[in-house]
A protein has these predicted regions:
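Generic alpha-helical secondary structure signal
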Residues: 7, 31, 64, 116, ...
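Cell-surface, membrane-associated systems
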Residues: 74-191
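Aliphatic-rich helix starts adjacent to a transmembrane/signal segment
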Residues: 13-66
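Short Cys/His-centered divalent metal-binding micro-motifs
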Residues: 69-70
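N-terminal leader/signal peptides at the extreme start of proteins
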Residues: 1-15
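Alpha-helix initiation/capping motif
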Residues: 10, 47, 51-54, 153-155, ...
């Protein structure tokens, strides 16, 4: 069969091999880019979720500590993590103290310290009563206490500054660093 110009019509119309290869290549590139973007978004979601869990946990721990410290007295900055004395003692220079002891509103001696990358609360100087205040997901690498104004008659209201540094996340790829600082002053008027 001839068309009007005199050439034969292509009765076997279709797609050539080169066209198929180009189409498959374009699809493969698009699929690879989409898969990479999906993996990246999944990692970002895991990082945000881990960070949120740890921030909520640390916020709860610091709020709990703050409420109890605020109503306490006899602030004592410990020289090591096993210093459970409740006699007033300042430590206002770097690196601060690794533990903090005070007498709470019920008359109990409370110590906060860092032990095995977790914040512990110890009642009446007995390590057997240690209450772990942070989740395993929150790895605390530094917990320092700076106490000012704890001795009587120094004309300063007792206060403690808590500095906390840690990491959130289990996988190295999605770990986030956390730095928190808070200052708490004693409610009782210092004598």
């Amino acid at each position: 069969m001839k068309d009007k110009i005199g050439k034969f019509k292509n009765i076997f119309g279709g797609i050539s091999l080169i066209e198929i290869l180009i189409a498959v290549s374009i699809f493969a590139v698009a699929a690879t880019i989409s898969a990479g973007a999906l993996m990246s978004m999944t990692d970002a979601q895991q990082k945000v979720l881990a960070l949120r869990i740890v921030q909520d946990n640390l916020s709860y721990a610091l709020d709990t500590m703050g409420k109890e410290i605020r109503t306490g007295s006899s602030y004592h900055c410990g020289i090591d993590i096993n210093d459970f004395l409740a006699t007033p003692r300042d430590c206002s220079v770097f690196p601060g103290g690794p533990s903090f002891t005070f007498i709470n509103s019920l008359g109990d001696t409370i110590t906060y310290r860092l032990n095995n990358n977790r914040i512990e609360k110890i009642l009446n100087g007995n390590p057997a009563t240690a209450l772990i205040m942070t989740a395993p997901d929150a790895v605390i690498v530094l917990l320092s206490f700076y106490v000012v104004g704890s001795p009587a008659n120094d004309e300063l209201q007792p206060r403690v500054t808590i500095i906390l540094k840690g990491t959130a996340g289990i996988k190295e790829k999605i770990k986030s660093r956390i730095n928190i600082q808070t200052t708490i002053s004693q409610r009782l008027i210092d004598s």
